[in-house]
Amino acid sequence: YAGSAAVGENASTIYFNPAGMTLLQDREFSAGLSMVRPSFKFKDKGSSTGILTGKASDAGGWAALPNAYLSWALDKDLYVGVGIGAPFGLVTKYNRGWLGSAHSIEFDIKTININPSIAWRVNDTVSLGFGLNWQRMEAEYLRRAGTVNAPGMPLASTFAKLKADDDSWGWNVGALFTLTDATRLGISYRSKIKHKLDGDLTGKGPIAPFNAAISSDAKATVELPDTWIISAVHKLDSRWELLGDVSWTGWSSIDKVDIKRTSGPMAGAIAQTLDTDFR
């Protein structure tokens, strides 16, 4: 939101700019809940996909994203705090018989981020902040194994499911500059977090030997993007403020995701590549 790295109006500044804790009272607690409802609709323009011909439903759905933050002053210039949130994730879910079910039926990514932080008021003009981020990611991906059935290989009637998770670390840093009694400038950076997900790829369909043949341990690597925020706030009078933000997110870090088998006769083979093309 506008001015997020410069406002420092409650404990959620731990996420946007930890240096902002030096603007808070001795102890502050902040909590919130964001409701997100994305929409993903597909329109077929004449593709041919074997026996899969069902229409696509809207893959979006409601998701609740909670957050909570606590900060407290150790002395007049040194503050510590901790934040808990869910910075990345959501769910896409189509009906099981839709036209593109060999590509995706359901994709569910959840993250939880715990962010202990510290802030130091260097002088009346400059404050600095630093935080560590422990992040857990859990992913589930469901699709049909293929678009057609063949003798002994009922691809279109078999579901392939990936379930994987990982814990990883990142960091964030920020600076707050009080230029005048009415004007502040904030700069913050959150690092990339690289997740090496490990889990299982399982098949579920009408022929047990085929289910076993496509099942294995699996892994995937996802590098969540880093972010920069530069914010400014200027108090015009007792009732009005001007706030502004320039932010950048390095989405190109998620170019593609290779799901690799790590056990069985096909160990080392790529089971599927998810091309994201984020820019």
Give the positions of each predicted feature:
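Outer-membrane beta-barrel porins/channels
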Residues: 4-5, 42-54, 62-279
